[in-house]
Regions:
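Short, non-transmembrane alpha-helical segments in secretory-pathway proteins
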Residues: 21-40, 81-101
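N-terminal targeting signals for Sec/Tat export/insertion, comprising classic cleavable signal peptides
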Residues: 29-62
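Flexible "stalk/tail and boundary" regions
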Residues: 90, 95, 99-113, 126-131
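Bacterial Sec-dependent N-terminal signal peptides
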Residues: 1-23
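Conserved histidines in hydrophobic membrane contexts and catalytic metal-binding motifs
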Residues: 53-54, 106, 111-121
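Short, glycine/charged-rich beta-strand-loop motifs at protein surfaces that mediate ligand recognition
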Residues: 17, 76-79
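Amphipathic N-proximal alpha-helical interface segments
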Residues: 53-77, 120-131
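Hydrophobic/anchoring residues in structured secondary elements
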Residues: 43-45, 78, 103-106
């Protein structure tokens, strides 16, 4: 019985720690500089070591931004309506049920588009080519 209680406490503490993500100061500073008006920010650490902030900006849809551990901005994803996807992307998705769509701006200046179809994220360039 004592072992079960100890195991239960360990699991609870482990789960709590897994969901409470505190990025390094350099990441927080980079985020605040890029998104000074961000609200309702929730941080998580991804498997690849990147830090992801999910947040809202006044007058915008839901957003997320990824940063490297040293504070470099990597990309920003903004939720958009299906109708806001470029026409070639919409054509490439014809006949598919799209649950969510997003525009992803990359640090190299490129923009790609994401469409969630059957629990999978499909990525396209503006010409409708799947990447």
């Amino acid at each position: 019985m004592k072992n079960i209680i100890l195991l239960s406490l360990f699991v609870i503490v482990s789960c709590t720690m897994a969901f409470s993500a505190n990025p390094p100061e350099v990441v927080l500073a980079a985020f605040k500089q890029k998104f000074p008006n961000a609200q309702d920010v929730d941080w998580s650490k991804e498997k690849n070591g990147e830090w992801e902030a999910e947040f809202e900006m006044p007058g915008s849809n839901e957003m997320s931004a990824n940063f490297s551990a040293d504070g470099r901005w990597l990309e920003t994803e903004t939720e958009i309506a299906f109708s806001e996807l470029p026409a070639p992307v919409i054509a490439a998705l014809q006949g598919k049920k799209v649950k969510e769509a997003a525009r992803i701006e990359k640090a190299d200046g490129s923009t790609v588009y994401e469409a969630e179809v059957k629990r999978k994220d499909l990525i396209f360039d503006a010409s409708g080519k799947m990447l």
